[in-house]
């Protein structure tokens, strides 16, 4: 089941990482790889603006540095929705087309599965800024497929890992 931190998964499991181009998202990719995932990346563009194009270029450059495949998703049609809801809708659609079970992001939040098998969102335990509120609008179906690899790490730990990973 999806989780946090350095849990381990079967080698054949695949995950589609929402890549922003930030060092933090690069660290999340490396953590997923260390957990045994085959990682592909996607950058979601919600508008046709210079800022969105620059962010997409940064994400593609990071993916190249990480040696992961990166696809660009044009999700302008979803731009009227909540930003995170739109981004994850685009990620899940792409994951389904690619036959990938999980999606991931570099948000500071944690996922846990309760005794009934329901995936629930929680704040990070690490003292990192709580970004679970940004994901609160996601449906249970999305949460069941979501992995948040940074949920157990403080920003200082992520910065140290970025140095170790030469990001």
Residue ranges and their predicted role:
Residues 167:
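Ligand-binding/active-site lining segments
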Residues 144:
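Short, glycine-/aromatic-enriched active-site segment of Class I SAM-dependent methyltransferases
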Residues 1-138, 147, 155-158, 163-164:
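ATP-dependent adenylation/nucleotidyltransferase module used to activate substrates
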């Amino acid at each position: 089941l999806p989780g946090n931190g350095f849990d381990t998964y079967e080698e054949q499991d695949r995950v589609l990482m929402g890549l922003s181009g930030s060092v933090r998202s690069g660290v999340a990719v490396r953590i997923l790889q260390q957990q045994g995932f085959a990682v592909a990346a996607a950058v979601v563009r919600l508008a046709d603006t210079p800022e969105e194009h620059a962010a997409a270029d940064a994400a593609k450059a990071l993916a190249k540095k990480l040696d992961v495949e990166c696809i660009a998703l044009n999700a302008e049609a979803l731009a009227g929705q909540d930003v995170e809801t739109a981004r994850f809708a685009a990620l899940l659609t792409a994951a389904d087309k690619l036959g990938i079970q999980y999606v991931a992001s570099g948000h500071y939040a944690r996922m846990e599965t309760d005794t009934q098998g329901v995936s629930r969102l929680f704040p990070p335990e690490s003292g990192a800024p709580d970004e679970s509120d940004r994901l609160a609008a996601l449906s249970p179906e999305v949460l069941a497929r979501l992995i948040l690899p940074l949920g157990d790490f403080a920003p200082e730990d992520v910065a140290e890992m970025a140095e170790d990973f030469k990001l």
